[in-house]
Amino acid sequence: MSDLDYLFKNPITVEKNASLSHVIAELLKNNISRLVVTDEKSSVGIITEKDIGLFLLTEETEKNLDEIQVSKIMNALTSVKDSENVENCVETMLEKRIGSLGVLKDDELVGIITKTDIAQHYSKNYSENHRVGDVMTISYVSMNSNSTLREVVSKMISEKISRIFLKNDNDEIEGILTFRDLFHVALEQGNSDSVLDNTDQSISVVFTRNGFLSDSGFGNTVQAKDVMTSNFASIDFDQDLAGACDVMIKNKINGIGVNINGKLGGVVSKTDVLKAIHIENSSK
């Protein structure tokens, strides 16, 4: 039995002709960041919340989300055989800059392995090998929490990031804003008759884009601090990286703040955990 047999999970799937609104609802309902896309039970691609977030905020179409099929924005699913070892999976994910791999048995998709699964593997097998500070990302993107949602979303688009830290006037971290937070806002605002004179229960892409980014949209009147997640996880830079994995897994998040002398000094993410395993691979 290979390492992957203990790690991979049965994928949550969606048909390629499913609507974007259905996909968003499934992501939020299951508290996950990606779905495998199928065509008559055969896997044909993958869709992530980051793919959807960037699409919603940059695409020029005026179609409703109910009219857009997931096949229009899905990406190819890279897969490995179920006999592959975890270390080689890590190298593939880093090389291709992807967050998940399909797992094949006899050319049939039997599961999916994600960075969360890799973090679980690290926590179990690499305890005390690395401190958080060894692999953390020193730089992070932040804005003032009093900024409008429009300003913050514009920054996320220009930086092509899915999360941003928000600080108060004393340069202290108050919270974090993610695409998942924006999905909730879009769905709530989309069902409000008073927003942008929108009386259609269906949410259009142009409504979402204009709502967040136009002068007249709700994004220009709502402050980021009103929709941010205030309680976010953090860890000290000198702690065991395995402990950071446990925190991310427990909170179902992809990254946490790293404290240096009591202040946020950077971020450690599941991608950094993959890099730690890469370091181990390179030293063998």
Show which residues each predicted segment covers.
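Tandem CBS (Bateman) regulatory domains
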Residues: 1-10, 48-78, 90, 114-142, ...
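Short glycine/proline-centered loop/turn elements that form peptide/ligand docking sites
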Residues: 7-11, 20, 43, 76-77, ...
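Short N-terminal helix-initiation segments at or just after the protein's N-terminus
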Residues: 12-22, 41-47, 78-83, 107, ...
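The conserved cystathionine-beta-synthase
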Residues: 13-31, 38, 79-97, 104, ...
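A glycine-centered beta-loop-beta connector
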Residues: 27, 35-50, 93, 101-116, ...
